[in-house]
């Protein structure tokens, strides 16, 4: 089976490895090298690095819509195109090239959380379950029928980064299982997505990192986990803007205005919210590194506590 693989970030690397064990990967498509780091040097994608290490042909077109790119893809004669977090919407002309169509590994239980940030939005919303889907691609954004899926609970203190790594491996396993069925002539049966359950996972933005104490503690705790490792939640704490890397929601009654420090100890700094309180466990001052609440308190002797 001849497969063209299209993917870009770390999430796609386990799936690329999985495909190479199941089929003949005739080409890998990934986004062009981008400036990164303080020096803004051109940096290859994780998928490109993996493909080069495996000796696979790599293509990095700016667009898939030009006649030249379409002809290049047709010349590869793929039986199937596998897409995992490629970051480019495939035009219908590309979807029509392989006999078996195009498969996509998506990090949610579709139709919930279609779009760019399904992992982060699931945690932000307080979902207790998520998973990965293998989808038959069509022209719409994550609208195609689901071929297979795997479910998993979202752990109470799991961050987006941790869930990302788990789902990447689950997606690779699901893809391997799907390819195994296809090779055996047992093509997975497409199941149309139900319109009633559709939600959209819009792309994250830095502006969302600013937390507002005028919200329930549970919601803020979910956002701290969702925005880890990027963009990292930020709050104003007694006049200082700090980033929050770890926090817990406390179910307690208080009569203080949101943003008031209720208690401070080596376990954390408890801040009043609209409902309950948020315990800040790991913080980062501007220009510094992430530190424990105890270390932060040693540096902030002026912190005022109101019981």
From Swiss-Prot:
Reactions the enzyme catalyzes: L-methionyl-tRNA(fMet) + (6R)-10-formyltetrahydrofolate = N-formyl-L-methionyl-tRNA(fMet) + (6S)-5,6,7,8-tetrahydrofolate + H(+)
EC number assigned by the record: 2.1.2.9
An example molecular function term from Gene Ontology annotations: methionyl-tRNA formyltransferase activity
Keywords associated with the record: Protein biosynthesis, Transferase
Positions annotated to bind (6S)-5,6,7,8-tetrahydrofolate: 108-111
Top EC category: transferase
Coiled coil (UniProt feature): none
Recorded GO CC terms: cytosol
Stored InterPro entries: Fmt, Formyl_trans_C, Formyl_trans_C_sf, Formyl_transf_N, Formyl_transf_N_sf, Formyl_transferase-like_C_sf, GART_AS, Met-tRNA-FMT_C
Family in the record: Belongs to the Fmt family.
Record function comment: Attaches a formyl group to the free amino group of methionyl-tRNA(fMet). The formyl group appears to play a dual role in the initiator identity of N-formylmethionyl-tRNA by promoting its recognition by IF2 and preventing the misappropriation of this tRNA by the elongation apparatus.
Protein name: Methionyl-tRNA formyltransferase
Record organism: Xylella fastidiosa (strain 9a5c)
């Amino acid at each position: 089976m001849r497969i063209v693989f299209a993917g870009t970030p770390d999430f796609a690397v386990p799936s690329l490895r999985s495909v190479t064990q199941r089929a003949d990967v005739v080409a890998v498509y990934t986004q062009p090298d981008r400036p990164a780091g303080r020096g803004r040097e051109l940096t290859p994608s994780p998928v490109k690095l993996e493909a080069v290490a495996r000796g696979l042909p790599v293509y990095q077109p700016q667009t898939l819509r030009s006649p030249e790119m379409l002809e290049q893809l047709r010349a590869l004669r793929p039986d199937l195109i596998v897409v995992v977090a490629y970051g480019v919407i495939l035009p219908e002309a590309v979807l029509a090239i392989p006999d078996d169509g195009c498969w996509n590994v998506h990090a949610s239980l579709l139709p919930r959380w279609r779009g760019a940030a399904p992992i982060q939005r699931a945690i932000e919303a307080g979902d207790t379950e998520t998973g990965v889907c293998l989808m038959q691609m069509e022209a719409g954004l994550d609208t195609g029928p689901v071929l297979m899926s795997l479910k998993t609970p979202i752990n109470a203190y799991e961050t987006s980064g941790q869930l990302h790594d788990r789902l990447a491996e689950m997606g690779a396993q699901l893809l391997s299982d799907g390819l195994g069925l296809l090779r055996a002539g047992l093509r997975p049966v497409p199941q149309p997505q139900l319109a009633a359950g559709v939600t959209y996972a819009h792309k994250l933005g830095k502006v969302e990192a600013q937390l507002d104490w005028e919200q329930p503690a549970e919601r803020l705790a979910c956002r701290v986990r969702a925005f880890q490792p990027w963009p990292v939640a930020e709050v104003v704490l007694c006049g200082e803007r700090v980033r929050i890397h770890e926090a817990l929601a406390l179910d307690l009654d208080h009569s203080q205005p949101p943003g008031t420090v209720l208690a401070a100890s080596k376990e954390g700094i408890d801040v009043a919210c609209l409902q309950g309180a948020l315990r800040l466990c790991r913080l980062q001052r501007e220009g510094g590194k992430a530190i424990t609440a105890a270390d932060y308190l040693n540096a902030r002797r002026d912190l005022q506590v109101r019981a």
